[in-house]
Design a protein with these regions (language model features):
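Bacterial N-terminal signal peptides that target proteins for export
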Residues: 2-13
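Bacterial N-terminal signal peptides
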Residues: 12-21
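Sec/Tat signal peptide C-region and signal peptidase I cleavage site
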Residues: 24-28
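Serine-esterase "nucleophile elbow" of acetyl-processing enzymes
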Residues: 29-95
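Alpha-helical scaffolding within the catalytic cores
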Residues: 34-36, 104-116
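Functional beta-strand-loop-alpha-helix junction segments that form "active/interaction loops"
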Residues: 91-106
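Alpha-helical cap/lid subdomain in secreted, periplasmic
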Residues: 110-303
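Histidine-centered active-site loop/cap adjacent to the catalytic His
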Residues: 266-366
């Protein structure tokens, strides 16, 4: 390793210290976590590529800067595609944990566009607004005195700016992709936010409930994400509905909660926000206890109350010195995937999101 490489590694390690919470002022708390894994199906040599761009969610972050969960949402989708197409699937994740939407757009989607330009690419997916929201939430929660909502509006505006730009770039570069998807945001820490802010609202003179403040912003981001998808030839994976709503009808309105919460094409932003924050508010559930039935729940969030849980213990190296790669057989056989669902599809956060992506997969690769 030459001197330049050593210096680069030191800078990367400093960034890692911030990412894991060790004090290192003036260093950005982001780290690239790139991986490539080929799902090697027996009896075929045909290989197609899935490319995923995003932050720690698509990375499969699991509390380590050295490795990520193998079965993150894009990998799960890749396994479904391998079954559907009877082919090998290379799952390429170009992700940056801690990154804002602008960073993901500029340095991952545009800066690393060559990965989706490969002629073997058949599916591209991205997510990008989570850290804008998390950082704005943290900033607001730390305020005292008069509440300043500007940080929340900035996060909303940045997501509104970079989401369609990301779609336009993917449309330009991923010319062989059969399907393009974007995931909207689930709400991590929903229950934890159900408390009073430290600051005082200038209009009411009262300390606002943090959940009441944040939920409308999440709803606006999600409506805009799905609306931009419809305008740019993308499919919107409604992770908010799938994670935050029970998989049965809890309020007796005749609809399964996770279905009733979905984005509806043609619905106005104002109507969607009202439906999420008021009409169906009572059906929202913290993802730490996602109800698949009235008596059965599964934890979709890790102990950090932010990142999705994942099936199995397998990991892929990533982080400081570049990405990790590997290959292996599918985890689930064709016989285990029934009606497009593996046996774990609704028991872990990443399994649920990966299944959500797979709902839009075409029947054939060409």
């Amino acid at each position: 390793m030459n001197l330049s490489s050593i210096r680069g590694a030191v800078r990367a390690f400093a960034a890692v210290l911030v990412t894991v919470g060790v004090s290192a002022p003036a260093v950005a708390s982001t780290i690239n976590q790139n991986t490539s894994w080929t799902i090697d199906r027996s009896g075929t040599t045909t290989k197609y590529r899935v490319v995923a761009y995003g932050d720690s969610i698509y990375a499969g972050y699991r509390g380590s800067v050295f490795n990520v969960a193998k079965r993150s949402a894009p990998w799960v989708d890749g396994e479904y595609l391998s079954t559907k197409w009877a082919s090998d699937i290379e799952v390429v994740r170009r992700t940056k944990s801690g990154a804002l939407a602008s960073d993901i757009y500029n340095n991952k989607i545009v800066g690393e566009r060559s990965y989706m330009q490969a002629t073997s690419t058949r599916a591209v997916s991205f997510e990008m607004c989570g850290n804008d929201g998390l950082q704005a939430r943290s900033s607001f929660a730390g305020q005292s005195g008069t509440c300043n909502y500007a940080v929340l509006n900035t996060a909303l505006n940045n997501c509104t700016t970079y989401t369609p730009l990301a779609m336009q770039a993917i449309n330009q570069y991923a010319t062989t992709a059969r399907v393009k998807t974007v995931s909207n945001l689930y709400y991590p820490g929903y229950n934890a936010d159900n408390g009073l802010a430290k600051c005082t609202d200038s209009a009411t003179g009262q300390r606002p409930n943090r959940q009441n403040v944040f939920l409308p912003y999440v709803a606006r981001i999600n409506w805009r994400t799905c609306n931009f998808a419809s305008q740019n030839g993308f499919q919107c994976v409604d992770s908010f509905a799938q994670w935050m709503g029970a998989d049965y009808d809890s309020n007796g309105d005749g609809q399964v909660d996770s279905v009733a919460l979905r984005y509806q094409q043609g619905e106005s932003e104002a109507a969607y926000v009202t439906r999420i924050t008021t009409t169906l508010r009572s059906t929202l559930r913290d993802s730490n206890a996602h109800l698949v039935s009235a008596g059965t729940s599964y934890d979709y969030l890790q102990s950090d109350d932010t990142h999705g849980t994942y099936y199995g213990s397998a990991t892929i190296s990533s982080g400081l010195f570049g990405g990790g790669s590997g290959s292996g057989a599918p985890d689930f056989s064709n016989a285990q995937i029934v009606n497009g669902q593996n046996p774990q599809w609704n028991r872990f956060g990443h399994e649920r999101m990966g299944h959500g992506i797979s709902l839009f997969d075409p029947a054939t690769p060409n």
